[in-house]
Amino acid sequence: KLLAFGISEPSNDRVLFGSISKAEPQEDGGYRFYGKKVFLSMGKYCDKLVSFGSDTSGESPLSVFAYLTPDAETFEVKDDWNTLGMKATQSNTVELKGIYAAEEQILTKVAPGPSFDPVVFGIFAYFEILLAATYHGIGKRALEIGIETVKTRHSVSNDAPYSQDKNIRWRIAEAA
């Protein structure tokens, strides 16, 4: 089974701290979710989805997190992912069109904003680790390429390899 996360929304800089999608409560205790989610990796192929929306039916809004089961009528995957080098992830935009979560599929309901709720904290913590690992890998590879490049290039002025230039060595040391 493939589990996807539909958290990010267009133009929503609150991310996990508040949704612009709607979570409409149903009489049976479940919710219907409406709105757009972006960068939903493997949305075309997922069996289950963790997502959230805002329930504004009470005195104070609540962020409602739930397991959702995609279907053709209420879960539309847009064919809009075309980022060079990342095509395989298929991180398309998804339109939630009343996708239903029964009461037992509701993971948590929390006030919008920073939270130590285990669901919110768990998603946030793992995302930050994955994001940091990605940028660490990019930086490490850039440093490796820089080191290799200065060994093979030479100064026109004195034919010395750039690896012997004190300013270039200083910049590489700073990057490390």
Task: Please name every model-derived segment.
Residues 39-77:
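A short core secondary-structure module
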Residues 83-176:
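Glycine-rich beta->alpha junctions and the first turn(s) of the following alpha-helix
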Residues 31, 37-40, 53-55, 129, ...:
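Helix-rich catalytic cores of soluble enzyme domains
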Residues 3-5, 19-21, 29-31, 47-51, ...:
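Generic beta-strand structural signal
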Residues 1-37, 41:
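Glycine-rich flavin
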Residues 14-16, 79, 87:
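Short solvent-exposed loop/turn micro-motifs enriched in small/polar/acidic residues
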Residues 7-10, 36-37, 54, 68-71, ...:
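Fold-independent oxyanion-binding glycine-rich loops
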Residues 36, 78-82:
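Short beta-alpha junctions and helix-cap segments that line functional grooves
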